Amino acid sequence: MAEMKSGDIRAMSEDQMDDAILNLKKERFNLRFQRATGQLEDTSRLREARRDIARIKTIAAQKRAGKTK
């Protein structure tokens, strides 16, 4: 999965964001195992997945804060 753009994330619904976070967490779990066993070739993907999760969580929090104002 390529790096997610913030514009794409903002277009998602809350359910889609939750699904994306779940998928990224699963991917991160698998990548960590690959790294531990020496099978991981693209080590930068770990960083991208971690930052994608943070990006989605940040935008979700901004959306929630915008609704309450």
UniProtKB/Swiss-Prot annotation:
One record GO biological process: translation
Keywords: Ribonucleoprotein, Ribosomal protein
Similarity-based family: Belongs to the universal ribosomal protein uL29 family.
GO-annotated molecular function: structural constituent of ribosome
Native organism: Rhodopseudomonas palustris (strain HaA2)
Record keyword Transport present: no
Ribosomal protein as UniProt keyword: yes
Protein name: Large ribosomal subunit protein uL29
